[in-house]
């Protein structure tokens, strides 16, 4: 019998082991769809981004008008731009859901997969930030100024780092040029990291909602989960295209319809919605260095998840107290997101400080305590 090229060809064999004959737990729910949705988001962003880059000019005098030109004069340029801008929002929705799933079901106990995932999140955040600057609108410019300026809080070398990043003494043409270069490069870095992420995942195999070893009950990825993923893709593309076609500017900032002007500061500088929770944590601390450290900690705290896992059970499926705490954390993050979009005024300041404090308390203190308590209640 002739060998099956799918199983013998060096390249096809890799595809086969990752997407066709991959042994997959039979009970994984729709929460396991977000990995493939993120892959779809990445491919969509790279494709639309490439088409946009063909019409974009990375120069302070031309950037804004080149984006306007793309929307007005390029065939379907408006659609490409709207898909790219809103695709970023859906990318973040998917990655936050994906992280939430990992946290809820104890997937972080696959340490290498979890840690590469956090690196992917950080790279995605960097990509989104530099991309937001490219249209050179008011909020693009001032967002770039405020966020890059945070590095000046680093003792001794901070100011030098900021001026080195800017390529001068303020955000200007060199900054825009290098941000465009970075925005082009980073998605390919994300693609590379994704392969590493998957390599680590396929070492151990997927977790499942029960958190138990499922080696005795695995099914092939294709046709079962390939079909399930296609359903997920259509359900993601539907709201994305709807948004791009009907309300493309819903999540954008109106300030970005005004070209960047270094002489006029917008009344309220804020990043895109997906960074607001971290921005609220940054603002809740009156000290500059303290705020920057809290901002970094808000994401880097995820690295500690495997170390803070004290429960004898892997998932939260049968741990009602931890479930309550988890959804409190979700509500807390939504409050932080709302606070980040509000001006720095009386009720919002104290709410932001309380929400920031509870965010860290829940993650670092309450989760381990609750897990230990549940162990005791179950006589583990």
From Swiss-Prot:
Where does this one sit in the cell?
Mitochondrion inner membrane
What the protein does?
Component of the ubiquinol-cytochrome c reductase complex (complex III or cytochrome b-c1 complex) that is part of the mitochondrial respiratory chain. The b-c1 complex mediates electron transfer from ubiquinol to cytochrome c. Contributes to the generation of a proton gradient across the mitochondrial membrane that is then used for ATP synthesis.
**UniProt subunit comment:** The cytochrome bc1 complex contains 11 subunits: 3 respiratory subunits (MT-CYB, CYC1 and UQCRFS1), 2 core proteins (UQCRC1 and UQCRC2) and 6 low-molecular weight proteins (UQCRH/QCR6, UQCRB/QCR7, UQCRQ/QCR8, UQCR10/QCR9, UQCR11/QCR10 and a cleavage product of UQCRFS1). This cytochrome bc1 complex then forms a dimer.
Cofactor binding note from Swiss-Prot or TrEMBL = Binds 2 heme b groups non-covalently.
Q: Which UniProt keywords apply?
A: Electron transport, Heme, Iron, Membrane, Metal-binding, Mitochondrion, Mitochondrion inner membrane, Respiratory chain, Transmembrane, Transmembrane helix, Transport, Ubiquinone
Q: Which cofactor does it need?
A: heme b
Q: Which residues bind heme b b566?
A: 98, 197
Pfam families per the record?
A: Cytochrom_B_C (PF00032), Cytochrome_B (PF00033)
What is the protein's given name? Cytochrome b
Top-rank taxon: Eukaryota
